[in-house]
């Protein structure tokens, strides 16, 4: 935003305006502020000119007052510039207090997750189930790798004229590729499963009694 910079004519007009019969305490304070800042908003200047044209002693036009015309750009307001020292100290205290609460909340969440992981004790049936799942996974991975290796070996032998060492390298490459892909997918599955278990255990069950029936 910008304001009109006071020139000699505007300054003289404001002083006459202040000493006129139309002035009051509030207007005097505003004019003193404008004179001190050496600038005035355009809206205020138009208001003064409109009001005081009714007085024959203060005949003037806005065109005459704005010669020469210069603008005064208002400085950008800085947050907290006019805060008192006590208020600034209170804000700093509230800021540190909020940071402390966030830190304590984060520590509590971390402790709850670690306690859940440490307190997990597997039963024999759960151990057997995990062993079966791991054996099944290893078997499925081996089947996938062997199937791909056999398919590559058969394709390079029947459809192409690759030498034996090239066929072996292709089989080895695709076998390792399938093995790595299966391991990555399985690890991702285990990670998501563990996250789901932790999230489920950290949930707080809320019960609400809707009504009570007495027989």
UniProtKB/Swiss-Prot annotation:
Name the Gene Ontology biological process terms. vacuolar acidification; vacuolar proton-transporting V-type ATPase complex assembly
Q: Which residues lie on this side of the membrane: Lumenal?
A: 156-167
Which ranges does the record mark as transmembrane?
135-155, 168-186
Q: Name one GO cellular component term.
A: endoplasmic reticulum
Give its localization.
Endoplasmic reticulum membrane
Tell me which parts of the chain lie in the Cytoplasmic compartment: 1-134, 187-215
Q: Does the keyword Membrane apply?
A: yes
Q: Which UniProt keywords apply?
A: Endoplasmic reticulum, Membrane, Transmembrane, Transmembrane helix
Membrane topology type:
Multi-pass membrane protein
The main location is: endoplasmic reticulum
Q: Record's Pfam families? A: Vma12
Q: Does the keyword Endoplasmic reticulum apply?
A: yes
Please share what else the UniProt entry notes about this protein: Present with 2030 molecules/cell in log phase SD medium.
Per its UniProt record, what PANTHER family does this chain match? TRANSMEMBRANE PROTEIN 199
What is the protein's given name? Vacuolar ATPase assembly integral membrane protein VPH2
This protein's species is Saccharomyces cerevisiae (strain ATCC 204508 / S288c)
Q: Which gene encodes it?
A: VPH2
């Amino acid at each position: 935003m910008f304001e009109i910079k006071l020139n000699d004519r505007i300054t003289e007009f404001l002083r006459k305006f202040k000493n006129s019969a139309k002035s009051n305490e509030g207007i005097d304070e505003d004019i003193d502020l404008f004179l001190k800042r050496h600038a005035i908003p355009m809206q205020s200047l138009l208001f003064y000119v409109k009001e005081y044209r009714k007085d024959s002693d203060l005949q003037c036009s806005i065109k005459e007052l704005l010669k020469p015309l210069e603008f005064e750009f208002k400085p950008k307001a800085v947050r907290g510039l006019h805060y008192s020292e006590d208020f600034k100290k209170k804000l700093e205290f509230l800021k540190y207090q909020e940071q402390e609460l966030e830190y304590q909340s984060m520590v509590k969440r971390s402790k709850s997750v670690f306690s859940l992981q440490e307190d997990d004790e597997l039963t024999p049936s759960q151990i057997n189930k995990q062993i079966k799942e791991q054996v099944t996974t290893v078997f499925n991975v081996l089947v996938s790798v062997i199937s791909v290796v056999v398919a590559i070996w058969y394709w390079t032998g029947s459809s192409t004229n690759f030498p034996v060492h090239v066929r072996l390298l292709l089989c080895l490459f695709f076998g390792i590729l399938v093995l790595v892909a299966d391991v990555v997918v399985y690890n991702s599955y285990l990670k998501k499963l563990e996250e789901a278990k932790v999230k489920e255990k950290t949930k707080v069950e809320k019960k609400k009694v809707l009504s009570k029936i007495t027989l």
